Every structure is written in structure tokens, then in C-alpha cells.
């Protein structure tokens, strides 16, 4: 038979640790959703700042000394 009935066994609850006691309050809000937009606007601001950061890094890379004297036109690849 593919399925099998297993007798109920007593499951251990696990050890209690100091770190677990400290972190327990952080998990008490698990599954709850704040009404409204919450921190969505803040997340959008940080995403925009990160995009600006990436553009700045790209500009620095494109103006790099490593690329001086290297032709970057598609015609040079033919």
C-alpha cells in the first residue's frame, strides 16, 4: 500500500536558548500585514537611489582609463 498510518508520537518541542528568547518578539508579528501602503514608498525611494548609484558606476566604468584607445564602435567588430 502506498500510504501508511503512523501512530501518534510525542514530538519534542526543541531546546530553549537565550538567542531564541531574544528573537521571539521579532517573530510575533509574522503573517500580519499593515493596512495601507506601509513602507512601499520608502522602498521605491531606495530603489530609485540604487538605480542612480548603478548609473553613476556605469558612467565611471565607461570613462575608465582602461577603455582609452579601444574602439567601441560596432564597425570595428566586422
Swiss-Prot record:
The modification Phosphothreonine is found at residue 3. One of the components of the core complex of photosystem II (PSII), required for its stability and/or assembly. PSII is a light-driven water:plastoquinone oxidoreductase that uses light energy to abstract electrons from H(2)O, generating O(2) and a proton gradient subsequently used for ATP formation. It consists of a core antenna complex that captures photons, and an electron transfer chain that converts photonic excitation into a charge separation. GO terms for cellular component: chloroplast thylakoid membrane; photosystem II. Keywords: Chloroplast, Membrane, Phosphoprotein, Photosynthesis, Photosystem II, Plastid, Thylakoid, Transmembrane, Transmembrane helix. InterPro entries: PSII_PsbH, PSII_PsbH_sf. One of its GO terms (biological process) is protein stabilization. PSII is composed of 1 copy each of membrane proteins PsbA, PsbB, PsbC, PsbD, PsbE, PsbF, PsbH, PsbI, PsbJ, PsbK, PsbL, PsbM, PsbT, PsbX, PsbY, PsbZ, Psb30/Ycf12, at least 3 peripheral proteins of the oxygen-evolving complex and a large number of cofactors. It forms dimeric complexes. It is a single-pass membrane protein. Its main location: plastid. This is Photosystem II reaction center protein H. The chain crosses the membrane at residues 41-61. Belongs to the PsbH family. The keyword Thylakoid applies. The gene is psbH. It is found in: Plastid, Chloroplast thylakoid membrane. One of its GO terms (molecular function) is phosphate ion binding. Phosphorylation is a light-dependent reaction catalyzed by a membrane-bound kinase; phosphorylation occurs on Thr residue(s) in the N-terminus of the protein.
Amino acid at each position: 500500500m502506498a500510504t501508511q498510518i503512523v501512530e501518534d508520537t510525542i514530538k519534542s518541542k526543541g531546546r530553549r536558548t537565550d538567542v531564541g528568547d531574544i528573537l521571539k518578539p521579532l517573530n510575533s508579528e509574522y503573517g500580519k500585514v499593515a493596512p495601507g501602503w506601509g513602507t512601499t514608498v520608502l522602498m521605491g525611494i531606495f530603489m530609485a537611489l540604487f538605480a542612480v548609484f548603478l548609473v553613476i558606476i556605469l558612467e565611471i566604468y565607461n570613462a575608465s582609463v582602461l577603455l582609452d584607445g579601444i574602439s567601441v564602435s560596432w564597425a570595428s567588430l566586422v
